[in-house]
A protein has these predicted regions:
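C-terminal membrane-solvent junction of multi-pass transporters and transport-like membrane proteins
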Residues: 160, 334-343, 381-432
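Helix-loop-helix junctions that connect adjacent transmembrane segments
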Residues: 11-12, 163-239, 243-296
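Small/aliphatic-rich secondary-structure junction motif
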Residues: 481-535, 551-553, 557-562, 610
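Extracellular loop-to-transmembrane helix junctions
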Residues: 17, 39-142, 247-251, 257
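Glycine-rich, Arg-bearing micro-motifs that act as flexible, cationic patches
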Residues: 587-610
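TM-loop-TM module centered on a large, flexible mid-protein loop between adjacent transmembrane helices
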Residues: 92, 123-128, 196, 243-311, ...
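Structural beta-alpha unit
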Residues: 554-585
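Membrane-interface "cap" regions at the ends of multi-pass membrane proteins
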Residues: 1-51, 64-68, 76-80, 88-89, ...
Length: 620
């Protein structure tokens, strides 16, 4: 087996329906990306102070570069997986795993940080005493609620997302326009747009400003949400770039505008300390008029959009896990479906616990969660930019429905977009800022990364697949294939001198989480009454059923036991099958019973012919 490539054959399954248009895609993307301003603005102001608008503008420029990279890559490879998928095509499965694992951390922290920001905005609507432990408790309750909702399988509505996006955009635009025409103190804001000026009010030094810019990057993460939905998008070549450009333009303008308005009514120090948990509600609450009515409205809007963002993070975890599991990058049991609700309950439970763990570890510190967020997100973004650059060089003739603009020609039909170069350098720089200046995010981030890589190596070796190669999936169509389901297994508890049939039945019932019934049939000759006394046979039958019960206990199964009298085993089994919903009958036999003229062989033939369910014979 080569370590460079490996082919795995899978069954062809129904593909996701392409139902999302540009408007729905924009709404879902905006709901994920647009929620970040509600906690990122305060974090940015904490470091960037009066230069917060500049930090947001620089982060916005990087976001635009990243968005254009995703527009090209998601249309070239319209599959789930985002940066993990891009890296798999450009590099190999190990690099793809690192990108996906970083993105998975990003999604988990999205759940944690979005849910944690909700109580701070809710208290603007319904005032309650401030307490970090109470906020953590409410956050844990919100995350658990989202877990239950996702396990039950409540569907996310694209139309609801679109409506919420419209309401949010109108509300944020109103804030910017109202301030612009009525009370915006632009000279005051401009006077504080200074960096590294000693003695100037609210002027950060260059180190603080770089940290502030890194925090501002948190406001723009989430563009992966659109790439993850590429497989469900109508006409992805047109729809994805359009939705990404709408998201890009709307967010950059509104975020910059809100930061300018904010610094007109609140000094940067208060915005980054006193109001760090709910900066947007604080801004409208400090308006010279209408603030006490506007603040609760924005508190409610923020809480709803943050709840949707947290839910999107949990959904993103399961989607990404499914995509990575298809390529054997994470254990496939992670997306095993719930027997009743048909949802990936195991992966949802694991990510719920991890999100709650991050909230508890943070001890109510948004900064810690933001650092961890940046650690994972910048790995994903950097890998996306590098994937574009590598594929532009290695495969210049690859079909690209959309190409990022502003290209530098490199000869032989090759070119590199300036936007991808800027994006790659910027995202790597932000990641290094987290690594060298944020010990909390760095330590937990590297722990996550190392544990993931070890798991990946172990899993790939266990599956005898290459670690650094490029796994390719070949799908084949088998029309007659249908997933087998077993809900109730019937096993004949015969006295044979072996337990093969009982063990087989128990193993199948355990695997399919099915009920199991064991029956022992006392055969009564036609010449005798059906209730004729056969004490010895009854004792043997009870002993056989006890053996069946003991074996079932070894498989942690609860077993139903039946002792019946009948003329033939075949007749008793057929009568039982007719009266109960059995999917499978398991019967143990001895070699000599298969002789052509034996009475048992004839019974076997009749059972096979007449049974309405599957019949399995175990010959010892």
């Amino acid at each position: 087996m080569s370590d460079s490539s490996e082919r795995v054959v899978h069954l062809e399954k129904k593909s996701l329906k392409r139902v999302l248009g540009a408007a729905e895609l924009f709404a879902i993307g905006y709901g994920d990306v647009g929620s970040s301003i509600y906690y990122a603005l305060g974090l940015t102001a904490l470091y960037a102070l009066g230069a917060t608008p500049i930090a947001l503008a620089i982060a916005g420029l990087v976001f635009m570069c990243t968005s254009l990279t995703y527009a090209e890559m998601a249309t070239t490879f319209p599959e789930p997986g985002g940066s993990a998928t891009f890296s798999r095509y450009a590099f190999n499965d190990l690099i793809s795993f690192i990108a996906g694992w970083g993105l998975l951390l990003d999604y988990i922290v999205t759940v944690a940080i979005s849910a944690f920001a909700i109580p701070s905005y809710l208290k603007v609507v319904i005032p309650y005493p401030h307490s970090v432990s109470l906020n953590i408790a409410i956050t844990i309750g919100i995350i658990l609620l989202l877990y239950v909702i996702n396990v039950i399988g409540v569907k996310h509505s694209g139309r609801f997302s679109l409506l919420l996006a419209i309401v949010t955009i109108i509300s944020q635009a109103f804030v910017v326009l109202a301030a612009l025409f009525l009370f915006l103190n632009l000279p005051y804001v401009l006077s504080h747009l200074k960096i590294g000026v000693a003695g100037a009010d609210w002027s950060p030094n260059w180190g603080q400003f770089l940290k502030g810019t890194a925090m501002a990057m948190v406001a723009y993460t989430g563009i992966e949400a659109i790439a993850q939905l590429a497989a469900e998008t109508r006409k992805p070549a047109l729809t994805i770039p359009r939705a990404i450009k709408w998201t890009m333009g709307t967010l950059v303008l509104l975020y910059f505008g809100i930061s300018v308005v904010g610094l007109s009514v609140i000094d940067p120090h208060d915005l980054g300390t006193k109001y760090i948990d709910n900066p947007v509600a604080a801004i409208v609450g400090n308006f010279p008029f209408g603030g006490k009515w506007l603040a609760p409205w924005f508190g409610l809007i923020a809480a709803i959009i943050l709840l949707i963002a947290a839910n999107a993070g949990l959904i993103g975890c399961s989607r990404l896990t499914f995509s990575m599991g298809e390529y054997y990058q994470v254990p496939r049991f992670l997306y095993r479906l719930h027997p009743r609700f048909r949802t990936p309950h195991i992966s949802l439970a694991i990510f719920t616990v991890l999100a709650i763990g991050i909230v508890i570890l943070s001890q109510g510190q948004l900064l810690f969660m933001a650092d961890l967020y940046n650690f994972g997100a910048q790995i994903a973004f950097f890998s996306a930019h590098m994937s574009l650059l590598v594929l532009r060089w290695r495969k210049p003739s690859l079909s690209r429905p959309y190409k990022a603009p502003f290209n530098i020609p490199l000869g032989k039909n090759r070119s590199w977009p300036i936007t991808a170069l800027i994006g790659a350098m910027a995202t790597l720089t932000v990641w290094f800022i987290v690594v060298f200046t944020k010990p909390g995010g760095r330590n937990l981030g590297f722990t996550w990364l190392i544990c993931g890589i070890l798991m990946y190596f172990f899993y790939r070796k266990k599956k005898q697949l290459p670690v650094t190669g490029q796994l390719s999936i070949e799908t084949i169509k088998i029309p007659e294939y249908h997933p087998m389901e077993l809900k109730h297994v019937l096993v004949a508890a015969r006295i044979l001198g072996n337990t093969d049939a009982l063990q087989t039945a128990c193993q199948l019932a355990h695997s399919f989480k099915a009920k199991i019934t064991a029956v022992h049939v006392i055969e009564i000759p036609e010449s005798l009454p059906i209730h004729a006394p056969f004490l010895k046979r009854e004792e043997q039958g009870e002993a056989a059923l006890k053996r069946a019960e003991a074996i079932a206990r070894e498989y942690n199964l609860s077993i139903d036991l039946k002792l019946l009298r009948a003329r033939t085993i075949e007749g008793a089994l057929l009568e039982l099958i007719a009266s109960g919903a059995y999917d499978l009958v398991v019967v143990g036999t001895r070699k000599e019973e298969w002789a052509k003229k034996s009475s048992f062989a004839l019974e076997i033939q009749r059972l096979l012919k007449s049974a309405p369910c599957r019949v399995l014979f175990c010959k010892s």
